[in-house]
């Protein structure tokens, strides 16, 4: 995510978001043009009054003064209407673009492989979806508007002033590109500092998220002071980054102030000289002073917006960084939709290594599971049990070999169709913030309330749900914090019951539960497994004694397979694992 993009590339990628808002943008720029012209006309009126009064005070008639007053009022009315549109509709356009970008980035993230979430901190991802895009609203509105206003003021004032005195005008305007050059160089440093600042905000978000989610662990170890120290360290680092940014911003302001002084000095010295020799008059001098003030105010306004612009550009850059992340698991053009799935699964010489590692987790693994068969996979930690459960729904792509469902390579099946036919119950249950009903119906969005009730009953969750104050409408808190471990697991099982998939993966589904909860959940899982092809990743080996077949996975591959009785009679690896597991449970 650390690729560097040029400004031109960022603008090229960002411009399409103006697409459906071009009418709004054009009208916004027209209003900006009217507002700018109103500002440019006032100095001309004052120049006319000054020269007229200097020439002959009798020419300043009441009619002339009233006429100029009416013109000024009309200009102010036009300016007010134009500014209302710019401030109201223009800002809404920026918010609409921000909304479109947030929709696109969230949709894109949903399509990224499971590996993306394992290699990127959730705080960083969250920061890019939310905080980074907040500043795009102002950027999308003010960037074209302020640039357009600056161009109009430069061009129109140049045309007007060049017709008054060529030398003085060129002397002043030749400083502008020099000023832009120096300001651009400091601008690049500001953007780098701004990007580093955003990255660190993501780190802080990740730290805060970890602290909040791990609040129970923090308090159980009485490590509140340690957490505060860790946060303080990161917070001070953020302050250092802000200091660096403001140092570059101060350099930016210094450049502006230097050229501000030089341009005023030029008008005062050279303008006074030309007045003395009769090349310009007092009205012209007044006009030059007002226009120079206007031009410098335009530059100053851009300077004032520069931090905002940098935040917007950084937000766009970090947005594009995620949008450029490619999904390495995509459907083929002719990918199939699974129908009438029996549930036969076959691993053919499957090898797998994680994307950021050359070490193979699985090496040349082959086995088959027949329709409706209940297969258990056991082994010590780190041999690849959970990896197998992640490969079947294609959360990761196999490095070598193939996985077949009903004789079809899963790479030839549409991912949605594949996963629609697989139910997964994990050790770490994730329940969404919301009600019990909302969490169960997540398994099948078009399910009726009766279907949800039936699923809850089959999962052994119905009785405890009905004891809750709001029953199915009970709010369960963030990640189901208001429920016990066993209750959360039964809700997740009900979700799979509702989905009713032909293939079921149980990834250490009861290993984190106490004995009482495990017994209840195990009973629900046995009901759930009936008639389905079931792969059980087991930690507590006593729960898989009734499996059709047990595969013993080691670093050398599948070293043993058979029923519980067959493997116990062999007195091999499984025999030792089982007895060790029983001894641990007794302790």
Question: What is the role of each PLM region?
Answer:
Residues 30-31, 75-94, 145-152, 173-197, ...:
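Alpha-helical transmembrane segments of multi-pass membrane proteins
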Residues 25-82, 162-167, 278-282:
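Transmembrane helix-loop-helix hairpins at lipid-water interfaces of multipass membrane proteins
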Residues 23, 114-115, 131-140, 144, ...:
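An intracellular "coupling" helix at the cytosolic face of ABC transporter transmembrane type-1 domains
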Residues 2-4, 95, 102-127, 131-133, ...:
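Short intracellular "coupling" helices and adjacent cytoplasmic loop segments at the cytosolic face
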Residues 55-61, 66-67, 160-174, 248-317, ...:
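Helix-loop-helix
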Residues 30, 38-42, 82, 130-175, ...:
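Hydrophobic alpha-helical transmembrane segments of ABC transporter permease domains
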Residues 9-10, 18, 86, 90-94, ...:
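Juxtamembrane loop-to-helix connectors within ABC transporter transmembrane domains
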Residues 332, 338-587:
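ABC-type nucleotide-binding domain
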């Amino acid at each position: 995510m650390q690729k560097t993009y040029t400004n031109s590339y960022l603008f090229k990628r960002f411009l399409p978001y103006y697409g459906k808002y071009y009418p709004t943008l054009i009208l916004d720029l027209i209003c900006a043009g009217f507002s700018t012209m109103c500002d440019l006309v006032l100095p001309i009126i004052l120049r006319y009054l000054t020269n007229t009064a200097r020439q002959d005070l009798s020419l300043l008639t009441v009619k002339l003064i009233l006429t100029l007053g009416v013109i000024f009022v009309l200009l102010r009315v036009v300016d007010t209407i134009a500014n209302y549109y710019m401030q109201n509709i223009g800002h809404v356009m920026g918010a609409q673009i921000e909304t479109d970008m947030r929709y696109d980035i969230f949709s894109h993230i949903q399509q990224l492989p499971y590996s993306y979430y394992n290699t990127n901190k959730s705080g960083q991802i969250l920061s890019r979806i939310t905080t980074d895009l907040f500043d795009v609203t102002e950027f999308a509105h003010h960037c074209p508007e302020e640039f357009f206003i600056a161009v109009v003021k430069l061009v129109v004032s140049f045309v007007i002033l060049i017709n008054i005195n060529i030398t003085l005008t060129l002397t002043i305007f030749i400083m502008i590109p020099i000023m832009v050059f120096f300001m651009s160089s400091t601008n690049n440093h500001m953007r780098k500092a701004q990007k580093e600042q955003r990255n660190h905000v993501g780190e802080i978000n990740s730290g805060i998220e970890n602290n909040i989610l791990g609040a129970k662990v923090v308090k159980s170890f009485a490590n509140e002071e340690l957490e505060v120290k860790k946060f303080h360290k990161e917070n001070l680092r953020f302050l250092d980054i802000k200091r660096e940014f403001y140092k570059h911003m101060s350099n930016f302001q210094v450049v502006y102030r230097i050229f501000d002084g030089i341009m005023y000095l030029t008008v005062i010295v050279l303008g006074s000289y030309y007045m003395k020799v009769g090349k310009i008059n007092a009205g012209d001098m007044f006009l030059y002073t007002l226009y120079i003030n206007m031009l410098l105010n335009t530059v100053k306004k851009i300077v004032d917006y520069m931090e905002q612009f940098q935040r917007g550009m950084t937000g766009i850059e970090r947005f594009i960084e995620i949008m450029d992340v490619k999904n390495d698991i995509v459907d083929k053009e002719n990918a199939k939709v699974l129908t009438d799935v029996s549930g036969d699964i076959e691993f053919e010489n499957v090898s797998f290594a994680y994307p950021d590692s050359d070490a193979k987790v699985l090496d040349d693994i082959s086995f088959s599971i027949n329709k409706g068969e209940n297969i258990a996979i056991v082994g010590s930690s780190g041999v690849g049990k959970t990896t197998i459960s992640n490969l079947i729904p294609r959360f990761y792509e196999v490095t070598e070999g193939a996985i077949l469902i009903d004789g079809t390579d899963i790479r030839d099946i549409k991912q949605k169709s594949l996963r629609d036919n697989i139910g997964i119950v994990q050790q770490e249950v994730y329940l969404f913030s919301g009600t019990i009903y909302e969490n169960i119906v997540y398994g099948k969005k078009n399910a009726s309330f009766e279907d949800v009730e039936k699923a809850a009953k089959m999962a052994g969750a119905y009785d405890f749900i009905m004891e809750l104050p709001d029953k199915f409408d009970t709010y369960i808190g963030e990640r189901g914090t208001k429920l016990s471990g066993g209750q959360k697991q039964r809700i997740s099982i009900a979700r799979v019951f509702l989905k009713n998939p032909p293939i079921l993966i149980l990834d250490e589904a009861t290993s984190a539960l106490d004995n009482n909860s495990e017994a209840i959940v195990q009973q629900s899982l046995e009901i759930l497994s009936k008639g389905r092809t079931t792969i059980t990743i087991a930690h507590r080996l006593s729960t898989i004694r009734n499996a059709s077949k047990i595969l013993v996975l080691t670093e050398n591959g599948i070293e043993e397979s058979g029923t519980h009785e067959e493997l116990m009679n062999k007195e091999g690896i499984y025999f030792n694992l089982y007895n060790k597991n029983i001894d641990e449970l007794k302790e």
